[in-house]
C-alpha cells in the first residue's frame, strides 16, 4: 500500500466521521 494513499484514506475517514458525528450530535463540537 502507498503511504500517500493511506494518508488520503485516513483524511477521508476523518472527514466522514466528523460529518457523521455532527449529523448525529446536532451542534456537536
Curated annotation (Swiss-Prot):
- Main subcellular location of this protein, as a coarse class: secreted
Q: Residue span of the signal peptide, if any?
A: 1-15
Q: Does the record carry Zinc-finger as a key word?
A: no
What compartments host this protein?
Answer: Secreted
Regarding tissue, the record states: Expressed by the venom secretory cell of the spine. The spine is a cuticular structure containing a single large nucleated venom-secreting cell at its base. It is an independent unit capable of producing, storing and injecting venom. On the back of D.vulnerans caterpillars, spines are grouped together by 50 to 100 to form scoli, of which there are eight in D.vulnerans.
Query: GO MF terms on file?
Result: toxin activity
Q: Which residues carry this modification: Asparagine amide?
A: 27
Question: What keywords tag this UniProt record?
Answer: Amidation, Secreted, Signal, Toxin
Q: Which GO terms describe its cellular component?
A: extracellular region
This protein's source sits in the domain of life called: Eukaryota
Per the UniProt record, which residue ranges are transmembrane? Answer: none
Q: Which family does it belong to?
A: Belongs to the limacoditoxin-12 family.
Q: What does this protein do?
A: Probable toxin. Does not show insecticidal, antimicrobial and antiparasitic activities. Does not induce increase in intracellular calcium in mouse DRG neurons, suggesting that it does not induce pain.
Q: What is this protein called?
A: U-limacoditoxin(12)-Dv72
From which organism does this entry originate? Doratifera vulnerans
Amino acid at each position: 500500500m502507498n503511504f500517500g494513499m493511506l494518508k488520503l484514506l485516513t483524511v477521508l475517514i476523518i472527514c466522514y466521521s466528523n460529518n457523521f458525528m455532527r449529523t448525529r450530535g446536532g451542534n456537536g463540537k
